[in-house]
Amino acid sequence: MNNTILPRNFYERPTLTVAGELLGKMLKFSNFSGIITEVEAYIGMDDPACHAARGYTNRTSVMFGTPGFSYVYFIYGMYYCLNIVTEAEGFPAAVLIRGLKLTEPLEANLGGPGILCKKLNITKEHNKQDLTISHEFCLYEYHLKPDYVCTPRIGISKGKEKFWRFKSCVLADMPKITLNNKY
C-alpha cells in the first residue's frame, strides 16, 4: 500500500468525479484499514437529498467548508454515517461512504454506512476532521481502479432518480458483516 495521504486537491474537484475515484482507495481509521467499495454523492442546495438543500445550518456547516473534511452525522436515532466534503469551499457537497472491504485487522465486507461506522467506532467526535493531515483518520491512494456501476441512491425519499450511487463490480465479493456479526 502507498502510504501517501490523498491531498486536499483530490477533494477540490466535482463530486461525481471524486465519488467514482474514491472506489478502490484505502480508508484508514485508528487500527482499521479497508478499500472503499461503495459511495453516494450529494451535491449542493439543488439536490433535495443533500443535507444542505435547506441551507446553511450548524449541522451542515462542514459541507460548506474546506474539502477533505469528514462530515459525520446521526440517523434514525441509532447510526452514524461518514461523508467526505468535496468541491470548492462555500459549495455544499459530500460523498457518503457506503461500503468498505476491511483489510485490517481482519478481512470482511462492511456493507451499509451505519454498519461501517458502527464496526469502526466512527461517531460524532469524528465530525469535522481534516482527512488530509492525520495518519490515524485519512484516505490513501491504493492504485486500484475497479470497474463500477452507477445506480440510483438508496435509503432516501427525495432525489432517488439521480444515478449517484457508485458501486464496485469486483470488490464486494466477500460475505457482508452485519450488526450481529462479532469480530
From Swiss-Prot:
Cite the Pfam families for this sequence: Pur_DNA_glyco
Instruction: Enumerate the InterPro entries for this protein.
Output: Formyl_transferase-like_C_sf (IPR011034), MPG (IPR003180), MPG_sf (IPR036995)
Q: Which domain of life is it from?
A: Bacteria
Name of the protein? Putative 3-methyladenine DNA glycosylase
Family according to the record: Belongs to the DNA glycosylase MPG family.
Q: Which SUPFAM superfamilies match?
A: FMT C-terminal domain-like
Question: What keywords is this UniProt entry annotated with?
Answer: DNA damage, DNA repair, Hydrolase
**Keyword field contains Hydrolase:** yes
GO molecular function terms noted in the UniProt entry: alkylbase DNA N-glycosylase activity; DNA binding
Secreted as a keyword?
Answer: no
Against NCBIfam families, the record matches this protein to: 3mg, PRK00802.1-4
Q: What class of enzyme is it?
A: hydrolase
PANTHER family attached to this UniProt entry: DNA-3-METHYLADENINE GLYCOSYLASE
| Annotated EC | 3.2.2.-
* Biological processes annotated in GO: base-excision repair
Q: Which cysteines link up through disulfide bonds?
A: none
Give the transmembrane ranges: none
